Amino acid sequence: MYSLTTTRYFLRRAKKFFKKHPDLKQAFEDLVEDLRHDPFQPHFEYHHLGGKLEGVQAVSLTRSYRVTLTIVLTEKEIILLDIGTHDEVYGKR
């Protein structure tokens, strides 16, 4: 099982995100629980990012919302970095 860590930035973004989208809180909790068991399940649409987000990965919360993260395989740790719409997370504002 993977351990889970968050950044301060993620906590601020998540607080704002769930204030706007309280209906997605359960989906996020389910996603996190599934990630902890196996972060490479196909339904996450797990993918590596490029450009200024090189070295970061992303998974889908819903069709419209993404969670960016880093997975440290040697330590079995997942670090949550950001949550939001595709454009918010990938910096296209």
Regions found by a protein language model. Give the residues of each.
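A generic structural signal for beta-strand entry/edge sites
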Residues: M1, V56, E75-E77
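Arg/Lys-rich, positively charged N-terminal/basic patches that mediate binding to nucleic acids
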Residues: M1-L31
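Enriched for short, Lys/Arg-rich terminal
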Residues: R12, K25, L61-R66, T70-R93
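A short, surface-exposed loop/turn module that caps and links secondary-structure elements
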Residues: D34-V59
